[in-house]
Every structure is written in structure tokens, then in C-alpha cells.
């Protein structure tokens, strides 16, 4: 495996590919000579490459790309054209058009294209999926997600493109359906061209919706999702290492007054709270192992190019709504909007 990018995320990929029994890091590429030299001291077995072109001369089976999103299409296209399987950091590409191009190229070359949506391989998210699939919560009413912190500011994308891919990929994986439309509002304080605070609302129809709050300006770090159902509700607090998931037997019961269509009796139910046992494990290790297994077995990745494309479509629609001050965007229109700045 070759890894392109040794900045923030690349070293994590290199560490996990090195630990995986089915992979070996044979090459590392980065344009920063000092950074490349430093990572090379930790992984002397890997050939150090100053460019992607130099890396493509090394015998490889696959490449992982951990570079800014604006470079994903060019780098992934070059690797797929060279006959390599590709794992690319989220989001898949900077536009719907670029994402569609990569999905088509991977299919044409018959190569695995996988997006590193790490949460889909985390034990808490897998546990939530089991709970939802078993009907523990009843009919899902709404999902609230808060993903806020002070930073880290990105130079090439806004806060929606930086943080919302986590939530959008989680919703895609857990719900198995796409929203009918979305709206987004936000503003940029550090830069007028990049929103650093944003709110995204997704309408799934049948009185189901999801609300996402993403923020680079919060004094507090919060990583929390609430799944509210007709029977029970679930809270996922990523920062709670011991009990990240809590299921609440709390809710309401509505008894319509038969004498008037305008009157209803609302009752409140308070029951037990329980937390499933979640085995601690590094999700990124599961990502690289899954990538290797898909290559060896010819299988479709859990977070394949199609899922990555669906996420990019939603991001593009959110940008369209942001640029129009929160107008609701049907997703067939949002898919056509392909600028990743707002």
C-alpha cells in the first residue's frame, strides 16, 4: 500500500496499515520534504516519494489518499488509471461531477474505490444500527446531531464540508434511505467565503427529519447524536468513553379526545435507562482491514464510492441552500450544484 499525504490524517493511516496483518506500507508520498523525512524515520521500510508520479513507479496494489479534498479527484483518478485500488479520505471529492467521475472510473477499471467514512466502522455506530434494525426505538421521529468544537479551521472547505460528512454518512448507513430535501443556514466569521457555523435540516418524509449543527467556533467540544423514536430514544455521546450509548425508555403517548378533533391528551412516560456494552476498538483499524478484505475478496466496501457520492450530493445541496439563505433544496436540484465553498 502507498499512502499519499503525511499531514494530519496520513500518519494515522500509515500506523494502522502497518499494524494490519494483510497490508504493508511500501511507499509514502508528500510534497513537504521535512514532513516526509520525519515520517520516514518512523517507517524506514517505506520508500519516500516527493510526488505522486514517483510513487506510481513503485510496485503497489493500492493507495490511500489523505490530502485536501480539492486534490482528491486528480490523485484518485491517477491511481485508478494506474490500476490501483483506492481508499480516499472523506469527502470523496469537491463536487458531484468529480465524485461521479471517480465512481465511473473505478467501475471501468474494476478497482475498489472506498471512502474513509471512519464512523461506519466504529463499534458504537454498529451497535446503534443493531438497535435500530431490531426496532428497539419504534418508529424513528427525528435525529439531532451536534458536532462542534473550537477549530480546526480548514482552508479549502467550509464547516459543512469538513464536519457534516460524518453525520451524513452515519445517517446513510443507519437509515438506508435518502432525504427528500434539505435546507442549510450558516455564516462565516473568520472568512466571509467560508461558513464556520452552520445548521442543516434534512426532510426524510413521513414526519421524519434530522438536524445537524456543525461549528468551528464553539468553546466546548460536543459530539452527540439523539435518535428519538415512538417507543424509546437513544443518545450517542462520543466523548463518553465508558458509556457512549444510552437508551431511554422515555416519551409521550397521545390519546385523541373523541369529542373533538382539536383536543388531545398527552401523557408522559418515564422508564429505565440502559447502556449496551461497547468494546473499545480503533475504528480506523477496522477501516484498513475492511479495505484489504474487499481487495482480496472482490467485495463491495461498506463505504464504497456510491455512498461517498451520495454524501457529496447532500453537501452540494447544503451549499446551494447556504448560498440562498436557507432555501429548501430538492436533492435532484442540489446534485447539480458543484462548488464546495459557501
Regions found by a protein language model. Name each.
Residues 150-220, 226, 240, 306:
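Rossmann-like dinucleotide-binding domain that binds NAD(P)(H)
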Residues 27, 62, 142:
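Short, Asp-centered acidic motifs that coordinate Mg2+ and/or phosphate
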Residues 1-43:
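N-terminal Rossmann-like dinucleotide-binding module
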Residues 20, 118, 231-302, 327-331, ...:
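C-terminal glycine/acidic-rich active-site capping loop/insertion
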Residues 83, 110, 135, 207, ...:
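Glycine-centered short loops/turns at secondary-structure junctions
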Residues 93-155:
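A contiguous active-site-proximal alpha/beta segment in oxidoreductase catalytic domains
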Residues 24-27, 293-311:
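Glycine- and charged-residue-rich phosphate/anionic-cofactor binding loop of Rossmann-like
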Residues 13, 43-104:
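Beta-loop-alpha module in the N-terminal Rossmann-like domain of NAD(P)-dependent dehydrogenases
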Amino acid at each position: 500500500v502507498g499512502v499519499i499525504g503525511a499531514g494530519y490524517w496520513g500518519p494515522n493511516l500509515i500506523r494502522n496499515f502497518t499494524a494490519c496483518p494483510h497490508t504493508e506500507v511500501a511507499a509514502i508520498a508528500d510534497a513537504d520534504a521535512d514532513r516526509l523525512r520525519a515520517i520516514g524515520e518512523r517507517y524506514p521500510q517505506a520508500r519516500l516519494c516527493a510526488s505522486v508520479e514517483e510513487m506510481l513507479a513503485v510496485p503497489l496494489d493500492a493507495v490511500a489518499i489523505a490530502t485536501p479534498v480539492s486534490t482528491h479527484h486528480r490523485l484518485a483518478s491517477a491511481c485508478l488509471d494506474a490500476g490501483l485500488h483506492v481508499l480516499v479520505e472523506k469527502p470523496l471529492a469537491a463536487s458531484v461531477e468529480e465524485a461521479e467521475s471517480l465512481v465511473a472510473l473505478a467501475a471501468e477499471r474494476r478497482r475498489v474505490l472506498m471512502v474513509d467514512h471512519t464512523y461506519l466502522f466504529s463499534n458504537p455506530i454498529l451497535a446503534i444500527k443493531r438497535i435500530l434494525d431490531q426496532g428497539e426505538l419504534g418508529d424513528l421521529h427525528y435525529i439531532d446531531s451536534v458536532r462542534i468544537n473550537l477549530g480546526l479551521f480548514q482552508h479549502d472547505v467550509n464547516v459543512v464540508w469538513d464536519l457534516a460528512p460524518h453525520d451524513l454518512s452515519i445517517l446513510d448507513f443507519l437509515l438506508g434511505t435518502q432525504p427528500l430535501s434539505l435546507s442549510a443556514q450558516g455564516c462565516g466569521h473568520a472568512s466571509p467565503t467560508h461558513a464556520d457555523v452552520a445548521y442543516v435540516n434534512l426532510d426524510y418524509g413521513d414526519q421524519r427529519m434530522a438536524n445537524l449543527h456543525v461549528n468551528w467556533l464553539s468553546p466546548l467540544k460536543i459530539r452527540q447524536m439523539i435518535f428519538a423514536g415512538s417507543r424509546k430514544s437513544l443518545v450517542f455521546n462520543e466523548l463518553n468513553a465508558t458509556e457512549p450509548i444510552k437508551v431511554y425508555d422515555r416519551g409521550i403517548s397521545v390519546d385523541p379526545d373523541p369529542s373533538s378533533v382539536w383536543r388531545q391528551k398527552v401523557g408522559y412516560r418515564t422508564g429505565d435507562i440502559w447502556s449496551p456494552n461497547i468494546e473499545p476498538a480503533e475504528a480506523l483499524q477496522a477501516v484498513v482491514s475492511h479495505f484489504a478484505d474487499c481487495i482480496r475478496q472482490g467485495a463491495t466496501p461498506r463505504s464504497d464510492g456510491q455512498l461517498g457520492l451520495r454524501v457529496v450530493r447532500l453537501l452540494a445541496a447544503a451549499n446551494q441552500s447556504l448560498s440562498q439563505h436557507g432555501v429548501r433544496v430538492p436533492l435532484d436540484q442540489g446534485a447539480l450544484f458543484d462548488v464546495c465553498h459557501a
